[in-house]
């Protein structure tokens, strides 16, 4: 969970010897024979998928940008009656060479059929499954509500190659839900690979699309001083991305859904499934599952807790991830639902992509706050304390932190549409039996 400077929750535990910068994947050296029998069976029943485009980018070798100091953004006066500017603080000009290269990225973001830049292949969503998410007028046309009710928040750093897929999928989702019903808020920080320039140039496209777009940059670095203040700084960055929502609550529909998405490669169907399950399950929060090591290892074990109060897999005092393949080892019910790709309740999650109700934010009851256990963990704790404890993981939605990683993840864990194949909206087995009582104890892991 990188936030404007590093948006992925790096595990700082000294005993863990890996990093997320794993060896690049060679797509053509994986075969279906390497997959588990149950996954193989699903693959055999699924339509054939095209091979991914060879991964490359015209900005693969970043051009050195001048050492400009990013504008953190000055504290603004609270105003709940009038909208804030989509550029709340003066933005730097950006690197001219990177600005010249940005139109290719903008074109890819705005056009899902653009093939100039490679990206993760994404299937077209099944409209019948998600049609109920689109507000409709009496004549059947997409209805434009008076106030936005979908708020997309991101903290991004140094990820220009990911933007065609990540932002492109968000744009597709906003078009589906109705652009005027959506708000996009991005906090960027310290990028010199073209991320800043592309996101800045996105303003005119969002204006034409009639999406309210808030973009700002920050000089906050969660890893400054060896990451000693990483958690409070990450919390601050997340709150910056939510500022347009929490500072102007009257501008938003009371039933607004917030999508907070990390620097992951995901598809439109992934985002829509998180929303679909939030609506269908009447959940307060839904999360994907994020993976590393070619989709073999669940990543966000630091933040996520089961309804047993434990991590998704056991990490002993040595800090070793030796048991990472043994998910939900002490929770048979959750393990069964995960293996069946059915939604299951958890005490906390984040997992690369999440959707949650904006109600406690609009009421000023909840915000991200610092704690050594991780700011999303305490965000979920605050949701529970205010009566928003219907938190679920949607195991049909699986993501990775690059196009290559997500391709490997979706080969092993499957695409969302493959995981829900044959499932109907009336399938009672998929419904969660919610537990509303708080847990007595939650495992605390302060040593990450």
Name the predicted role of every residue range.
Residues 251-266:
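Short beta-strand-to-loop acidic/aromatic patch adjacent to the donor-nucleotide binding site
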Residues 25-30, 334-448:
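C-terminal catalytic/acceptor-binding lobe
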Residues 135-138, 159-175:
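Short, well-formed alpha-helical segments that are part of the catalytic scaffolds
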Residues 1-42:
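N-terminal signal-anchor transmembrane helix specifying type II single-pass membrane topology
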Residues 151-159:
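A conserved hydrophobic helix/loop-capping motif in glycosyltransferases and polysaccharide synthases
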């Amino acid at each position: 969970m990188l936030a404007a400077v590093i948006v992925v929750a790096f595990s700082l535990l000294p005993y863990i010897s890996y990093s997320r910068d794993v060896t690049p994947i060679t797509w053509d050296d994986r075969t279906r024979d390497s997959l588990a029998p149950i996954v193989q069976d699903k693959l055999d029943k699924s339509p054939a998928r095209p091979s991914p485009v060879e991964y490359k980018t015209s900005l693969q070798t970043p051009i050195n940008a001048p050492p400009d100091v990013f504008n953190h953004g000055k504290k603004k006066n609270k105003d709940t009656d009038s909208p804030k500017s989509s550029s709340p603080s003066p933005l730097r000009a950006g690197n001219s060479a990177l600005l010249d290269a940005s139109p290719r990225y903008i074109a890819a973001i705005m056009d899902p059929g653009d093939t100039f830049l490679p990206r993760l292949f994404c299937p077209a969503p099944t409209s019948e499954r998600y049609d109920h998410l689109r507000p409709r007028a009496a004549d059947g046309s997409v209805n434009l509500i008076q106030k936005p009710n979908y708020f997309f928040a991101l903290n991004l750093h140094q990820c220009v190659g990911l933007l065609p897929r990540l932002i492109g999928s968000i744009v597709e989702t906003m078009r589906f839900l109705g652009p005027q019903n959506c708000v996009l808020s991005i906090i960027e920080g310290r990028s010199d690979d073209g991320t800043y320039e592309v996101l800045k140039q996105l303003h005119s496209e969002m204006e034409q699309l009639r999406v309210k777009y808030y973009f700002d940059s920050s000089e906050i670095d969660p890893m400054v001083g060896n990451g000693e203040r990483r958690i409070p700084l990450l919390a601050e960055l997340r709150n910056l991305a939510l500022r347009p929502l929490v500072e102007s609550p009257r501008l938003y529909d009371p039933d607004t859904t917030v999508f907070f998405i990390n620097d992951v490669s995901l598809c439109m169907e992934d985002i829509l499934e998180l929303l679909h399950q939030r609506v269908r399950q009447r959940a307060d929060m839904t999360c994907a599952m994020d993976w590393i090591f070619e989709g073999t290892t669940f990543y966000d074990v630091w933040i996520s807790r089961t309804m047993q109060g434990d991590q998704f897999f056991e990490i002993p005092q040595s800090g070793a991830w030796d048991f990472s393949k043994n998910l939900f080892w002490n929770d048979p019910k959750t393990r069964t639902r995960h293996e069946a790709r059915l939604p299951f309740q958890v005490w906390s999650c984040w997992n690369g992509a999440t959707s949650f109700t904006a109600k406690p934010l609009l009421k000023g009851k909840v915000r991200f706050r610092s704690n050594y256990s991780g700011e999303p963990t305490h965000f979920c704790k605050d949701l529970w304390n205010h009566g928003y404890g219907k938190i679920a993981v949607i195991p049909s939605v699986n993501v990775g932190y690059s196009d290559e990683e997500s391709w490997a993840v979706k080969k092993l864990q499957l695409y969302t549409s493959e995981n829900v194949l044959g499932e109907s909206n009336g399938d009672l087995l998929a419904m969660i039996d919610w537990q509303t009582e708080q847990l007595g104890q939650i495992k605390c892991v302060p040593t990450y």
